[in-house]
Amino acid sequence: MDNHYDAIIIGGGVAGLTAGLHLAERGLRPLILEAGERVGGRLAGKEDILINDWCFPNEHGVHGIWSSYVNFKHMLRRHEILPTLIPAQEEQWIYRSGKRIGRAPIGSVIRHSRLPAPLHYIQLFLLPQFLWLLDLRDWVRIFSVWSTLLMAIGIDPFVEDQPLEGLTFGEELKRWGPALRALFFGLTRNGLSTDPEQVPLAGFLAFLRFYTIMRRDAWAFDYLPNGGGEVCENLAVKIMQLGGEIRLKSRVIRVDATRGGDSTAHIQHDGLTESVNAPFIILASDSPGAESVIKTSFPLESTSLFFPHGLAHAVIRLWFDITPRKNPEAGIFSGDFIMHNFFWLDKIYDSYRKWHDETGGSCIEVHVYGPQDVLAQSDAMLLTNVLRDFYRVHPELKGHLIKPHIQRNAATHTLPALGARGTHLGIETPWENLFCAGDWVRHTTPAFFLERACATGIEAANCVLRSRGLDEFELQTYPPPEPLAAWIEASMMRGRKNRRGKRLAK
C-alpha cells in the first residue's frame, strides 16, 4: 500500500470532505482518514431502521440547510450533487408553564415579517397566539430583551476576535420575563444544543447575527430530501473519482510535523498501527478529536490552547399508525418540557412521505439536549418521560405508538465559543504545514456548523494550494445586513470605537 500522499486530512466530516474535494480538483492526491464507519461526521448516515418491514434511512439528526450556507450549497451545486431541497414552511413554538400549554407559529412570521431587520421580531407581537403565551413580567422586562438584541447587532465576536470571557447567555436571560426567556432558551437549545448557562455570550451573539437578527430571510432554510448521508456519500465518490483516497475506521493517534519535509500521521486501524506521510496535514476532526491529536502530538506547546466543548444529545423517533391534527413540520419545545425540538419526518423525507401515503402513519423526531442528569437516564426512563410530555401536546396519538427508537449521539457537537486571544487555533497553526478546518476553528467568517466547516475546509485547502503554487478557490460572500440593521450596527460600532479612544486618551 502506498503510504505517501500530497496531503493527509484527519477527519472525514464536512470540513475534511470539503478540503479533500478542493485539493483533488487541483490534481493533488489527498488521503482522508476517518475514524468512523462512514464519512460525513455529524452529517453522516447511520444504519437503517426497520419498522414493520419498512426500511427508514437513519442519521445523526435532521439538519437544516440555511439560506446563509452559501459555500456549502455552492460546492454541492458546482459538482451537481445538491438534491432538490425541501423548503421549510413553519416552525412552531410550543410553550408549557405548569399545566398550561400554548402554541404559536414563529418561523414564517420572522422570515416574512413586513418590518425590516432588526425590527422583524415585532411582527410576533401582532399574533394573538403569541401574545397569549406572555404574562405581565414579559412586558415589564421587554427592554432587557431589546438590549440583548442590540448587543448582538453592535458586537461581532468572530470578526473582532472578541471572546467576552466569563460571560454566558444564561446571565443575560435572567433579566428577561419568563415566556420570552423560555422562547430564547428553546432557540438556544435548538441551535446550540445546550443550556443557556453553558453558552458563552460571544457564541450566542454570533449565532443571532448569522441566523436571524441581521436579515429576515436569514431564518429561511431547507431540508435535504434523503438526509445528510446521501450528500456525504456523493461527496466521497466525487473525491475518489478525482484521485483522492478515503480510509474508514482509521483513527489518527498523533502526528509528527517536520520543518521542510514530510509529516507523519500515526493511525490505528483494526487493532493495527501504521504510518502515512505527506508534506501537508489538515486536521479536520471534531473539536474533542482535534484536542486529542494536538495534545498527544505536541504536549508541551499545547498546554494553554483552547478547544470548544463537544456536546452529546439524544434523538428519539416515534412512529404512530395515525396522523395527528394539523401541525407544522418542525418547531421547538420550551418551558416545562423534557424535549427541545421536533421534526415530523413524514412531512420532510421522501421515504417517510411514501410510508405515510401508503399507511396513513406519522413519525416525529425529537431531540433532548440535556441537562446532564436527564441525558444520564436509562433509555427506558428517558423514553417514558418524553412520551409523557409528548402526549400532553398530542393526546390524540396516545395508544397509537407503533415503535420508538432512541439514539445517543456522542459528545462531538461543537459549542460555539472563542478562546482567549492566542489560545484558539485558527486555520494556520504554530506548526509548519499543519492546518485546521472545522466548525470549531477560529476564523473571521460569521458562519456556523455545516457552513463554517465547509468554509474553513476550503480555506485550509487554499493554504496547501498556495504552498504548491496552484490556483486557490474563492469563498462565496454572505448576504449583507438589511439597511436598517447595517445602520444600527455601524452607529454602535462607531460609538464603541469613540469610547475606546476617549479611555485611551485619559
Protein language model regions, located:
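N-terminal Rossmann-like FAD-binding beta1-loop-alpha1 element of flavoenzymes
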Residues: 3-32
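Active-site-proximal substrate-binding core of FAD-dependent oxidoreductases
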Residues: 463-506
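Helical element adjacent to the flavin cofactor pocket in flavoenzyme catalytic cores
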Residues: 207-272, 280
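Mid-domain catalytic core of redox enzymes
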Residues: 26, 248-365, 369-375, 380, ...
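FAD-binding beta-loop-beta segment adjacent to the flavin cofactor pocket
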Residues: 351-358, 410-436, 440-445
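Glycine-rich FAD pyrophosphate-binding loop
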Residues: 24-49
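Short beta-strand to alpha-helix junction loop
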Residues: 63-70, 159-165, 171, 176, ...
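Mobile amphipathic helical/loop "lid" adjacent to a hydrophobic cofactor/ligand pocket
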Residues: 73, 77-78, 82-199
